[in-house]
Design a protein with these regions (language model features):
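Glycine-centered hinge/linker elements that transmit conformational signals in sensory
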Residues: 179-182, 225-255
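Conserved N-terminal structural module of periplasmic/extracytoplasmic solute-binding proteins
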Residues: 4, 8-11, 19-104, 122, ...
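Extracytoplasmic/periplasmic substrate-recognition and gating elements
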Residues: 57, 61-62, 162, 237, ...
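Hinge/lid segment of periplasmic solute-binding proteins
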Residues: 24, 74, 97-151, 177, ...
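Long, aromatic- and glycine/proline-rich binding clefts that accommodate carbohydrate-like moieties
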Residues: 297-298, 346-403
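Short helix-initiation/N-cap motifs at beta->coil->alpha
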Residues: 72-81, 100, 171-177, 253-267
Length: 428
């Protein structure tokens, strides 16, 4: 898949029709009760559980012949759970997950092209470039509920305490460093250190995706248009030089997962950090007052870059289990990815941008105070080519970040080792 800049913009409302038949399917769905299995780690997360339980209740009330059976496992285990179940002949019908999960599930032979299951009118309502970001061999294999670049969240109260204007967040990495010098001198009410800037580097795939977004900030790349490793560029080197500098100055918590950064931010011990837009729900679930001190800003500009970021999305990855379950799954997906279902979700739980043209003018998005500062970044999103071993690549990026921070390794030497190891991993 070719690299693309992705422009996710708020457009005028477009009304589209709906079809109850999946594209290209002449097989007749059986009548009678149907159960579809949906793998969903969010059922185990307190901030999201009530929403998904209500989705099941409302959908089953509207579709009495269809039953939703949840398959749950923690975030880091749900994909393995799905694959292991399939190996035993028990396949789910959909996986609620992240865009980076798509290539692995396609490679495992589980994911189906979305147009094989969903109605043409429904699929055609999605922004074309968003759908292209889910493509494998020219076909989209995931359907997004909503999308977002990585955004910069910052604590307005800490900015004030440091003598900084809370309405003027940094725009460049150099500005961020000057802000960080002041913010790093603060202590919280209990005398705990305040970290100035958070960039996740822990050994989980999403941390690697976040590091890729940082490379994009600096105008660099990790993979070329053909999906080959391509890190001999200044932007890549500059990004990891920044990771190293943030560590040396003590600004960034070492080996932190996104959930660790969210916890520190919620407790007032982290002034700025990069996150997916929906990460704010994790912050708010820890500290409800976060609504009053949190603001968002565009990704920082570094080196020769323009502050581009990486597209992130929560999506459904679909599995074809025959006509009856396929037809039921079509109804379920269209029920969930609708303004009626997602309006309160995007307003109260997960600030993000709709992926459908007909949902662009939703009040819960247009007037979302948390999203306001980061909104222009939606037009500067760069797509990472899909490769089957994207998770392995992301883990190697984390290992590189840890090598130049915790390991105190020389940057150039660490990059050379990364190139050698990552090349082998992604070619397997």
């Amino acid at each position: 898949m070719n690299m693309r800049k992705l422009s996710v913009v708020l457009l005028a409302l477009i009304l589209v029709g709906a079809s109850v038949f999946a594209a290209g399917k002449t097989e007749q769905a059986a009548t009678g009760p149907v159960t579809i299995k949906v793998a969903n780690y969010a059922l185990l997360e307190s901030g999201y559980e009530p929403f998904w339980k209500q989705v099941k209740t409302n959908f089953e009330a509207a579709n009495p012949d269809i039953t939703i059976e949840w398959v749950t496992a923690p975030y880091g285990e749900i994909v393995n759970q799905v694959v292991n179940m399939a190996g035993g002949g028990n396949k789910v019908d959909a996986i609620f997950g992240e865009i980076d999960w798509v290539p692995g599930l396609v490679d495992a032979g589980l994911a189906a092209p979305v147009r094989d299951i969903l109605s043409p009118a429904f699929v055609d309502d999605f922004y074309p470039d968003v759908l292209k970001s889910f493509e494998v061999d020219g076909k989209p294999y995931g359907i997004p509920l909503y999308v977002s670049p990585y955004v910069l969240y910052y604590n307005k109260n800490l900015f004030k305490q440091a003598g900084l204007d809370p309405n003027k967040p940094p725009k460049t990495y150099n500005e961020m460093l000057s802000y960080a010098e002041k913010l790093s001198k603060l202590k919280d009410a209990n005398g705990n250190k305040v970290y100035a800037f958070g960039q996740t580097t822990a050994s989980v795939p999403v941390s690697g995706a976040s590091l890729t977004a940082m490379v994009f900030n600096f105008g660099g790349q990790v993979l070329d248009a053909q999906g080959k490793l391509s890190v001999d560029n200044q932007g890549f080197k500059d990004a990891f030089a920044m990771v190293k500098q943030l560590d040396e100055k003590g600004y960034n918590p070492q080996n932190a997962k996104l959930k660790d950064l969210r916890n520190l931010f919620a407790l007032g011990q982290l002034a700025m950090y990069y996150d997916q837009s929906w990460g704010f729900n994790g912050v708010k679930s820890i500290n409800a007052d976060a609504v009053n001190f949190t603001a968002s800003a565009e990704p920082l500009v570094g080196g020769s870059g323009s502050g581009q970021s990486l597209l992130q999305a929560h999506c459904f990855i679909l599995v074809d289990n025959g006509a009856a379950r396929r037809a039921a799954l079509d109804k379920f997906v269209e029920f969930v990815i609708s303004e009626k279902t997602l309006s309160s979700y995007l307003r109260d739980l997960t600030p993000a941008y709709p992926a459908k043209k007909s949902m662009a003018s939703m009040e819960s998005v247009v007037n979302n105070g948390i999203l306001k500062g980061a909104s222009p970044a939606a037009g500067r999103v760069q797509v990472q080519p899909f490769i089957p071993r994207i998770s392995d690549l992301n883990l190697e990026l984390c290992a590189l970040a840890q090598a130049v921070t915790v390991g105190k390794q020389d940057l150039n030497s660490a990059i050379e080792k990364f190139k050698s190891t990552a090349s082998v991993k992604i070619s397997q």
